[in-house]
Amino acid sequence: MTDNAPITFDGKRFAAHLSTAPGVYRMYAADDTLLYVGKAGALRKRVASYFNGTPKNTRLTAMLAQVVRMDVTITRNEAEALLLENQLIKSLTPRYNVLLRDDKSYPYVLLTREAWPRIALHRGPQIVPGRYFGPYPGVTAVRDMLNLIHKLFKLRSCEDSVFRNRSRPCLQYQIGRCSAPCVNVVTHDNYTEAVHRVTLFLEGKSDLLAEELIQAMQVASEHLEFEQAARLRDLLTSLRSMQNRQYVDGRAADLDVLACAALSGHACVLLLSFRDGRNLGTRMFFPKTNGEERTAEILSAFVSQYYAEYPPPPEILLDQEIPDHTLLEAAFSRSSAHKISLRWNVRGERAGYVELAVRNAQVALSTELTSQRAQRVRSEAVRQLLGLEGPIKRVECFDISHTMGEATVASCVVFDAVGPVRSQYRRYNITGITPGDDYAAMRQAIERRFRRAVEEDKQGERPDVLFIDGGAGQLAQAKMALNAVGVESVLLVGVSKGEERRAGHETLIMLDGQELHPGAASPALQFIQQVRDEAHRFAITGHRARRQKTRMTSKLEDIPGIGSRRRANLLKHFGGLAGVKAAGQTEIARVEGISTALAAKIYASLHGLSKNDAANASRVS
């Protein structure tokens, strides 16, 4: 037997020695790639079913042909196996499982736990002490909710650093969206009462909130506090108006509606969410499938993965029956504080919700496939233009952004054959170079990106084509960076706007000096423009954020004569750097520890003026 003889796996023999207990099984290829993760109520029976007879479809045939080993984990019950399966699928992303691809964390409403709580939109890890309400299907729903809360209940939204340093109410107070707890315009008792009402509102207890408002209004009237009674009356009117606008069905309470559409090997799962009877909108998911799963299987995989991460509502409506629905209900109910019900074949208004979700899923999938087809045509045009042998699987593009050398940021965006892969975008804060040296910035960014790929041996993350936003000089720097880390298999292409800098007149520059002029109507150039423009957008937004952060933290410290104490006095007096910048020299000089001369220096520095200009401004102010 030679060293390179194929490895065979005797699945029947492996299955015969397995336990009949519930658990999770994993299948691996020769290179240790994880092919598939599955759960079973009885491991021996489930695993044996793969190797008894002919596989039922080509996907299964292809997968089993690659299996060289398996391992299993026994669990106490099938529900525990389901949870472990979901965890492994999410963390290990097996090749042949249906994968929920969602590179965004869901937005929540955060109500902080402190003396004067603030309310805000929150994404990411829940490490800030407080209550988190959600998740919501999209950021628009959260912003609409927060706008309503600020209008009705006037809770603060400012960060603690701003809250602690204010000496007068901010603009939010002036426009009636905050009660100015920062300067004690509202009493602590009244603010706490507002927080309580917001909590009821976010918990979906609008009817209970309305009852409390009516009682409070009656008490205020009995005590002849007519202004307070009028405010409560207006709040109650606004609340009822909001209920009339937003409640689709008072009986709907908290529920999610899910529908799945599939076409040409692609799938879309649409989520329609209601909380407290309010329609919070829809969200579309396009899970990675292998093209042969039934929609019920796709929907089942989605339900198990999605609600393993996000808390399910008491009622989930489906457009069809799914496998393991009883097991899923039991698992979700066990991990939640309430019973979870999965329902299909519903009637009345709920049937209307399901029908709406089905139509939206079909439209979303059709739109996505049209977009993907157009993207594939453009990708193929790029392949032909550049003379590549195989299809393009991955392209990357780098761009540099700075303001006269300040806060330099490099971006790297990633596209595959069907569009952007935003979860793999990267930004690089550039340091240790001469300000404004774009060549050095490009070289540093590319070295950092590919050195990590080389060190971690991530061949799959290397692009077929690497576009550089720039001409021959930038292209040469990119080549030097790749040589420095030992990467040779990446095709480098410079994208130059040319002398006229007009869209559609870009020139593609190759390493050998060859220039390509695709023309404005070229599908290849349209693809390249999309990639280049996305890299530019991603670089600029990163640069602006870094520049703003730098300026907010260091602008005052850079002024001679301003130490930590004077800086604190200025920020406290004016409520932040923006307030200092908006003030005149005379007003700045009124701050403790700030002389007239120092005020002039501060004003000049913040406005980029010379001493003479500052003196003239002083006479005007």
UniProtKB/Swiss-Prot annotation:
Organism for this UniProt entry: Xylella fastidiosa (strain M23)
Domain GIY-YIG: 20-98
Record protein name field: UvrABC system protein C
Family to which the UniProt record says this protein belongs: Belongs to the UvrC family.
Domain of life: Bacteria
Its biological purpose: The UvrABC repair system catalyzes the recognition and processing of DNA lesions. UvrC both incises the 5' and 3' sides of the lesion. The N-terminal half is responsible for the 3' incision and the C-terminal half is responsible for the 5' incision.
Example of a GO cellular component annotation carried by this entry: cytoplasm
Span of domain UVR: 207-242
Subunit structure: Interacts with UvrB in an incision complex.
HAMAP family, sorted: UvrC
GO biological process terms on file: nucleotide-excision repair; SOS response
CDD domains: GIY-YIG_UvrC_Cho (cd10434)
InterPro entries (alphabetical): GIY-YIG_endonuc, GIY-YIG_endonuc_sf, GIY-YIG_UvrC_Cho, Hlx-hairpin-Hlx_DNA-bd_motif, RuvA_2-like, UVR_dom, UVR_dom_sf, UvrABC_protein_C
Compartments reported by the entry: Cytoplasm
Keywords associated with the record: Cytoplasm, DNA damage, DNA excision, DNA repair, Excision nuclease, SOS response
UniProt GO MF annotations: DNA binding; excinuclease ABC activity
Membrane-crossing residue ranges in chain numbering: none
